[in-house]
Amino acid sequence: MQNILVVEDDYDQNQAICYSLKKSGYGVYGVTFMEKGKQTFIENQIDLILLDVNLPDGEGFSFCQWVKKQREVPVIYLTARDMEEDALAGYESGAEDYVTKPFSMKILLRKIDVILKRTASANHRIFTDEN
């Protein structure tokens, strides 16, 4: 089972996203603070992160940069910040995608599926090439 970390400070939205992900067969960790997200990331095998930009204890951009220094894990931003410079900052921080709210859960689930399949395929090629 692939595990997704949801870092979203709006509790109701966090719960709704987590519910949809669980229903789609993913293992899910939902947190509302960046520091709790870091702790959860360190303690668990996380395969993808859904990340808000505006968090009570910091900006998602710095969290994404921190994650990328730990190991390569795909990050998708989910945010109300729809300015071009925010999206560019999101990609520059290392994210695979930048999705603005409101969003379609069906489309988000498809994006997650595509990214996880691409990541698994790349990891398989690396493993095969090394042996």
Kindly give the residue locations of the regions a language model identified.
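CheY-like receiver
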Residues: 119-131
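N-terminal/domain-start alpha-helical segments
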Residues: 1-119
